[in-house]
Every structure is written in structure tokens, then in C-alpha cells.
């Protein structure tokens, strides 16, 4: 099980890889995107990622990460704490 996590600009939730796949890229604030996955949306860009592989897609008020579409790598459920996003397996 590998783990990839980081936060950007104080607000931004990260996604951790699971199932031995080791995929999952940190989501950025605003419209920031990292390697075509974890694209931001909804102002703060909580863990959104739509596309052929669907890395770390986000939804809901705080955009808890949930992989779906294609292979759906990099699911996570980060905690919201003082405006910072910390990654964690869920």
C-alpha cells in the first residue's frame, strides 16, 4: 500500500493510493490540476478528477475523495481540519 498526500494553498485535499495500485494524486485549489488528475472545481477544488481513469474524484460539500469512472484509482477520505486537508485511507 503506497501513499501520496499533500495540500496546496492551505485548502486542498489529497488522495492516497490503495489496493497496491499506488495511484492517487493530490487535489489542488481552484482550477489547479496535477498531471491531469485531481483537477479542482467548485471554487476550492476538493479532490475532483474526471476522465478516462477518474483519479481521486471529489463530491459533496467538502469534496471527500472517491474514485470512480474508468479504473477509479486513488480513493481517499481526507479530514477537514482548520482549513487544511490531510490525506488518509478510508
UniProtKB/Swiss-Prot annotation:
Q: Name one GO cellular component term.
A: cytosol
Q: Give a short account of what the protein does.
A: In the hair cortex, hair keratin intermediate filaments are embedded in an interfilamentous matrix, consisting of hair keratin-associated proteins (KRTAP), which are essential for the formation of a rigid and resistant hair shaft through their extensive disulfide bond cross-linking with abundant cysteine residues of hair keratins. The matrix proteins include the high-sulfur and high-glycine-tyrosine keratins.
Report, as the record phrases it, the tissue specificity of this protein: Detected in the upper portion of the hair cortex.
Family affiliation: Belongs to the KRTAP type 19 family.
Region 26 X 2 AA repeats of G-[YCGS]: list its residue ranges: 5-84
Q: Which InterPro entries match?
A: KRTAP_type8/19/20/21/22, KRTAP_type_19
Name the domain of life this protein comes from. Eukaryota
Please identify the protein, giving its name as recorded: Keratin-associated protein 19-1
